[in-house]
Curated annotation (Swiss-Prot):
ATP binds at G6, P7, S8, G9, A10, G11, K12, D13. It comes from Agrobacterium fabrum (strain C58 / ATCC 33970). The gene is phnN. Gene3D superfamilies: P-loop containing nucleotide triphosphate hydrolases. Catalyzes the phosphorylation of ribose 1,5-bisphosphate to 5-phospho-D-ribosyl alpha-1-diphosphate (PRPP). The lineage of its organism: Bacteria, Pseudomonadati, Pseudomonadota, Alphaproteobacteria, Hyphomicrobiales. This is Ribose 1,5-bisphosphate phosphokinase PhnN. One of its GO terms (cellular component) is cytosol.
Length: 183
């Protein structure tokens, strides 16, 4: 199981889309879609949108391998990922640094890819989204850490430059994981 984490604006979705395009048609890799209590037209990643009530029902029914709450939303990784892992596939999921303890409990073999970018790059990308002023963004970035806390197998990828540069590193991690994956 590979979980992709990093701050807003680091380019997690862009890099996951890049890797999915590079691996299109190749067996052994599964990019899972998160279930989120956010509208599909809210922008951002391609996800399965559900209401809070629906999410709670799914969670109570054991439909998630991992679930967590952040920023007023609930997120879930479908339990169907276990079938892919049992088949020997490399499963790639968009996660959260705050949810890594849950991922660690749910998956015995876990690789974390921490996507980071320079603060000025994060600020520019976040500013382009138009949700916060540049000053608010810079203050928030000064207070935040890009590090992953905990005892995890982490590869940090700097996505401050060209997507192809960070994409090459992501592809190496995925290829190495495929080589060591066991059914």
């Amino acid at each position: 199981m590979i979980v992709i984490v990093g701050p807003s604006g680091a380019g997690k979705d862009t890099l996951m889309d890049y890797a999915a395009a590079q691996l299109s048609g190749r067996p052994g890799f599964h990019f899972t879609r998160r279930v989120i209590t956010r509208s599909c037209d809210a922008g951002g990643e391609n996800h399965d949108a559900v209401s809070m009530h629906e999410f709670n029902q799914l969670e109570d029914a054991g439909a998630f391998a991992v679930s967590w709450q952040a920023h007023g939303l609930k997120y879930g990784i479908p339990a169907a990922v276990y079938r892919h892992l049992e088949a020997g596939d490399v499963v790639i999921a968009n996660g959260s640094r705050s949810a890594l303890p849950h991922f660690g409990t749910a998956f015995s073999r876990l690789k974390v890819v921490n996507i980071v970018a320079r603060p000025d790059v994060l600020a520019r990308r976040l500013e382009q989204r138009g949700r916060e002023s540049r000053d608010d963004i810079l203050r928030r970035l000064e207070r935040s850490s890009l590090a992953v806390a905990g005892d995890f197998d982490v590869t940090t990828v700097d996505n401050s430059g060209a997507i192809e540069d960070a994409g090459k590193t992501i592809m190496q991690v995925l290829q190495q994981s495929a080589g060591s994956s066991q059914p």
